[in-house]
From Swiss-Prot:
Residues 118-283 are cytoplasmic. Residues 153-164, 198-213 have a biased composition (Basic and acidic residues). One of its GO terms (biological process) is spermatogenesis. Glycans are attached at S41. Pfam families: TMEM119. It is found in: Cell membrane; Cytoplasm; Endoplasmic reticulum membrane; Secreted. Keywords: Biomineralization, Cell membrane, Cytoplasm, Differentiation, Endoplasmic reticulum, Glycoprotein, Membrane, Osteogenesis, Phosphoprotein, Proteoglycan, Secreted, Signal, Spermatogenesis, Transmembrane, Transmembrane helix. The chain crosses the membrane at residues 97-117. This is Transmembrane protein 119. The gene is TMEM119. It comes from Homo sapiens (Human). Residues 43-52, 238-264 have a biased composition (Low complexity). The keyword Endoplasmic reticulum applies.
Length: 283
């Protein structure tokens, strides 16, 4: 029996030596065939003793993995094909880090802006103080102490300067009108040429009578007729008054001057139309 099993064992050893450089995928079917051969060797002992024959040669089946080594794929995302895909992959990988850094940067910017705005408000309040202090919001006349509505509190103190400017302008206008009224001459009724002439003639006659009476008195007292300056000044003043009253028209003025010259003729020598400025008593 031992001599009958020896050829089969040699064949198996040769097959095993030939299958050593094969891959792990071929080792599994080789082990299975080896076990089958060993199990079936006992059955074939009787037949091999009578007629020893070699079994047909075994040809292992080729698997697709025996053709050559394949590239091993590494774990992880595939490399990006363009720039945008790279940015998207970067944000996906570091989304938490980006969120934390962004929130901190936003908080820092908010604090800086709030500090700058507060500083500007303080500077503005220093240069332009509030026109309404806090004490003005309390009604001192309210003895009951009732709270006032916010709408009742005035936003700003009433400005009285426009009223003062208006009063001053009105006062100036009133002063100008009063000054112009004072400068105007009093209204007088226009006198006719006949009335003015009559008034001048009456005044001239009265002055002549006074002058003659004074001359008679002086002649009686001293025996020398002396013309006093008063007697000569009075006709001059009367003539001037008559000329002013009748001076509204040029014709009336000329008539009054002629009448005055005629009235002054017998009283004194006609040295000048008016003897008010220079009067020399004649002895």
């Amino acid at each position: 029996m031992v001599s009958a099993a020896a050829p089969s064992l040699l064949i198996l050893l040769l097959l095993l030596l030939g299958s050593v450089p094969a891959t792990d995928a071929r080792s599994v079917p080789l082990k299975a065939t080896f076990l089958e051969d060993v199990a079936g060797s006992g059955e074939a002992e009787g037949s091999s003793a009578s007629s020893p024959s070699l079994p047909p040669p075994w040809t292992p089946a080729l698997s697709p993995t025996s053709m050559g080594p394949q590239p091993i794929t590494l774990g992880g995302p595939s490399p990006p094909t363009n720039f945008l895909d790279g940015i998207v992959d970067f944000f996906r990988q570091y989304v938490m880090l980006i969120a934390v850094v962004g929130s901190l940067a936003f908080l820092l910017m908010f604090i800086v802006c709030a500090a700058v705005i507060t500083r500007q408000k303080q500077k503005a309040s220093a240069y332009y103080p509030s026109s309404f202090p806090k004490k003005k919001y309390v009604d001192q006349s309210d003895r009951a102490g009732g709270p006032r509505a916010f709408s009742e509190v005035p936003d700003r103190a009433p400005d009285s300067r426009p009223e003062e400017a208006l009063d001053s302008s009105r006062q100036l206008q009133a002063d100008i009108l009063a000054a112009t009224q004072n400068l105007k001459s009093p209204t007088r009724a226009a006198l006719g040429g006949g009335d003015g002439a009559r008034m001048v003639e009456g005044r001239g006659a009265e002055e002549e009578e006074k002058g003659s009476q004074e001359g008679d008195q002086e002649v009686q007292g001293h025996g020398v007729p002396v013309e006093t300056p008063e007697a000569q000044e009075e006709p001059c003043s009367g003539v001037l008054e008559g000329a002013v009253v009748a001076g509204e028209g040029q014709g009336e003025l000329e008539g009054s001057l002629l009448l005055a010259q005629e009235a002054q003729g017998p009283v004194g020598p006609p040295e000048s139309p008016c003897a008010c400025s220079s009067v020399h008593p004649s002895v």
